[in-house]
Amino acid sequence: MMVVCPIFLYALTLLLIALYSRNMGRPTMISEIYYGTGRSFMMPCVLVALALSFLPVMLDLGGQQWLAFLTCMGLAFVGAAPAYLSQGERSVHKGAAILASVAGTLWCITMEPCVVAVAALMAIIATLTDRRCWLFWCEVCAMSSVAVTVVLKTLGA
């Protein structure tokens, strides 16, 4: 039952991305939504909430818990420092985004390697068909692999 809130927030994140893409065009990366919405804090707040809701679930599921922690804290810092074009926030944002993606992927590999393989294949196909938004597709696939791994492990438990 604890997985309902994180999955709801994940679905909300995808909905916000889809609505933004429909109205403004597909962003080159998820973080671009912050600037595209006039520096609205909606997406950063959702990312922080998503990270904090996934943390206890990921820790309970096992795997390498330090990777689960780094994944969620990285995503929380991405949301906490959304102004990646600002000199003061750029290094925090960029480092946190890289940390969240790498740690999330490694955590998923320790839990459900097949999910990572499918997500990587999807990212490659999306990147080849939409080269301008390659980073966006990699981010969506990385975030989705974590969500799918959480759902699969929760249902299997």
Over which residues does each language-model region extend?
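Helix-coil boundary and interhelical linker segments in multi-pass alpha-helical membrane proteins
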Residues: M1-V4, L55-W66, L106-V115, L155-A157
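Membrane-proximal helix-loop-helix units in multi-pass membrane proteins
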Residues: Q65-A119
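N-terminal topogenic module of multi-pass integral membrane proteins
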Residues: M1-L61
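Terminal transmembrane helical module of multi-pass membrane proteins
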Residues: E112-A157
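C-terminal TM-helix exit segments that contain a strictly Trp-centered aromatic cap at the helix terminus
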Residues: L14-L19, A81-A83, L152
